[in-house]
Swiss-Prot record:
GO CC annotation terms, alphabetical: cytosol
Keyword Protein biosynthesis on entry: yes
tRNA-binding among keywords: no
Functional description taken from the UniProt entry: Responsible for the release of ribosomes from messenger RNA at the termination of protein biosynthesis. May increase the efficiency of translation by recycling ribosomes from one round of translation to another.
Classification via InterPro entries: Ribosome_recyc_fac, Ribosome_recyc_fac_dom, RRF_sf
GO MF entries: ribosomal large subunit binding
Gene Ontology BP annotations: cytoplasmic translational termination
Compartments, record wording: Cytoplasm
Lineage of the organism: Bacteria, Pseudomonadati, Pseudomonadota, Gammaproteobacteria, Alteromonadales
Any one Pfam family match given in the protein's UniProt record, by short name: RRF
Name of this chain's protein: Ribosome-recycling factor
Family (UniProt): Belongs to the RRF family.
Keyword vocabulary terms for this entry: Cytoplasm, Protein biosynthesis
CDD domains, per the entry: RRF
């Protein structure tokens, strides 16, 4: 039973780290990356559809994304969806391809993005600590039911704390890498 609690905590913490990594990937740096447009939904026959389902997103060069839309009647809708997103991008269409030049980030915008990234990292840390709290309370419940000893509880709590420290360290490493990426000119 204790092993199940530990494994569950470990997998949930790993999911928290992965979710934090995915949230940080959405933050725009100076470099073009297809995942930048993952959050954009395009109205397709009245249904909000992810951009990658209506077109192929690729990197043209380090500061330009290109979208090849599958259905040419969707070009205007894709452009409108990109412009109305909070990414601050200005698409240009050329035939069946939409090019999106990424403007260079200003120093002020970089600092704002670093604040956003730090907030995401803190949310990830909080999620990991919540998993730790849940796991520790599950172990204490086992002790109350006399299914394990006090020594088992202490040992398990120490192991769960080690998992927590390791996963928070991963989040901190992701944060450091993202901050360095944002500060690159």
């Amino acid at each position: 039973m204790i092993n199940e609690i530990k494994e569950d905590a470990k997998s949930r913490m790993a999911k928290c780290v992965e979710a934090t990594k995915n949230q940080m990937a959405k933050v725009r740096t100076g470099r073009a990356h297809p995942s930048l447009l993952d959050s954009i939904k395009v109205p397709y026959y009245g249904t909000p559809t992810p951009l990658k389902q209506v077109g192929n997103v690729s990197i043209e060069d380090s500061r330009t994304l290109a979208i090849t839309v599958f259905d040419t009647t969707m070009i205007a809708a894709v452009e409108k969806a990109i412009m109305s997103s909070d990414l601050g991008l200005n698409p240009m269409s050329a035939g069946t391809t939409i090019r999106i030049p990424l403007p260079a980030l200003t120093e002020e915008r970089r600092k704002d993005l670093i604040k956003v990234v730090r907030a995401e990292a803190e949310n990830g840390r909080i999620a990991v600590r919540n998993v730790r709290r849940d796991a520790n309370s599950d172990v204490k419940a086992l002790e109350k039911e006399k299914e394990c000893t006090e020594d088992d509880v202490r040992r398990t709590e120490d192991e769960i704390q080690k998992f927590t420290d390791a996963h928070i360290k991963q989040i901190d490493e992701i944060l450091t890498a993202k901050e360095a990426e944002l500060m690159e000119v």
